[in-house]
UniProtKB/Swiss-Prot annotation:
Alphabetic keyword roster: Cytolysis, Secreted
Subcellular location(s) per record: Secreted
Transmembrane segments: none
BP GO terms, sorted: killing of cells of another organism
Tissue expression notes: Expressed by the venom gland.
Species: Tityus obscurus (Amazonian scorpion)
Protein task: Presents moderate hemolytic activity at physiological concentrations (micromolar range). Does not induce mast cell degranulation, lactate dehydrogenase (LDH) release from mast cells and antimicrobial effects. In vivo, injection into mice induces increase in nociceptive sensibility, but causes very reduced or no edema formation. It also causes no alteration in rearing (standing on hind limbs), but does not impact locomotion.
A GO CC term assigned to this protein in UniProt: extracellular region
Organism lineage: Eukaryota, Metazoa, Ecdysozoa, Arthropoda, Chelicerata
Name of this protein: Cryptide Pep-10
Length: 7
């Protein structure tokens, strides 16, 4: 799976 965050 792929997970990313921004902020």
């Amino acid at each position: 799976s792929e997970s990313n965050t921004c902020g």
